[in-house]
A protein has these predicted regions:
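Active-site-surrounding "flap" and adjacent substrate/cofactor-binding loops of secreted or lumenal enzymes
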Residues: 1-4
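A two-mode feature
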Residues: 14-17, 21, 30-338
């Protein structure tokens, strides 16, 4: 698409409509905004309640996490995100040598949180988590066994795999004939590893005991998904085929679709015909990704299900207060210097 450009793509727009309808193509648009992805990686490294005991369970394992990520967003700038990304992507065997860098990053975030976070409870949760990390930097989840596995295009490929699984479930397809990806030497192996991992998870879920599946199906983070999606049913179980040499027509069509849709979303110049095509594709596409807008959308979806404060009965209020105070006592007993 980039080689053809607007001038040579515009004349084939009618053919693209015809081909799309005739072949009944399913189009998915999945994206990652890199600054937001770096922010989410920082959140995962610091606020994992399974590693950082100062983080309340609900602040990590429920959609309440989206409030924390949004608050964390107000504390970072481009330089801090670069530092955080470097610490998240360093190989894990080297992370011990970066402990001072982790402490410096968290100390800067703590200083900003003390003055920028207006909500008292949010400020308390964030500063407690940062204080724990400053005291125990190597207990956090910085570093990775393989930087390629958390590269944006490999993570985004997981959205693609879930999209393929969704189509298979909807159309009742038992096995895809072929899954072809474009040639990306350093990432194709990681893409196949991601596919194999998700397929293996699906197989494991299928063999799990009913009570184990029940825990997963009732998890707060899974409320918006149906049972088949949660259990990863339909995940591609054939090895990826990497396009070799001249890209096949399917890869070329995907490239054209993505090029046009990217330019529509980024408000870049297009002919009226191509712009109409892009809008038409996006309206019918499966659409998901990692960006601040999508994170806020997920929070708002959850918030709509919550009762208003005045609708909570006295037992619910007492339980909420007790949960908060019990956690405060546990944090105070940690002696993390707050």
């Amino acid at each position: 698409a980039n080689d053809l450009g607007v001038a040579k793509l515009t004349p084939i727009v009618p053919d693209l409509y015809t081909l799309h309808r005739k072949m009944q193509f399913e189009f998915g648009y999945y994206f990652i905004e890199k600054p937001t992805f770096a922010l989410v990686m920082l959140f995962e490294a610091v606020f994992d309640a399974g590693l950082n005991s100062a983080v309340p369970w609900v602040s990590y394992w429920t959609p309440m996490r989206f409030l924390l990520i949004n608050a964390l967003h107000s504390l970072v700038d481009h330089r801090l995100l670069q530092q955080a990304w470097a610490l998240c992507t360093v190989r894990r065997q080297s992370i011990a040598r970066r402990a001072d860098d982790i402490v410096a990053l968290l100390t800067t975030l703590d200083a900003r949180a003390s003055s920028r976070i207006q909500d008292a409870r949010m400020r308390e949760i964030i500063r407690d988590a940062l204080a724990y990390g400053i005291k125990k930097p190597l207990e956090l989840d910085f570093g990775t066994p393989d930087p390629n596995l958390i590269a944006p295009n490999v993570v985004c490929f997981q959205f693609v795999l879930h999209g393929i699984a969704s189509v298979r479930r909807r159309k009742g397809r038992k096995r895809p004939a072929k899954v072809t990806v474009d040639q990306q030497g350093q990432y194709n192996g990681s893409q196949e590893e991601a596919r194999w991992t998700l397929s293996s998870i699906a197989e494991g879920f299928g063999q799990a005991r009913t009570e184990d599946r029940g825990f997963l199906l009732n998890h707060p983070m899974m409320r918006h998904l149906d049972e088949q999606a949660i259990l990863h049913q339909g995940m591609p179980n054939v090895e990826l085929s990497v396009a070799d040499g001249h890209p096949p027509i399917g890869i070329q069509l995907v490239d054209v679709y993505l090029w046009v849709c990217n330019r529509v979303r980024n408000r870049q110049p297009l002919s009226p015909e191509l712009r109409d095509l892009g809008v038409w594709l996006l309206k019918q596409a499966s659409f998901d990704g990692i960006g601040m807008d999508t994170l806020r959308m997920r929070w708002e979806q959850f918030e709509r299900e919550l009762p208003a404060i005045h609708e909570m009965d006295s037992d619910q209020v007492r339980f909420a207060v007790k949960t908060r105070e019990d956690h405060r006592e546990r944090v105070q007993a940690m002696n993390i210097g707050r």
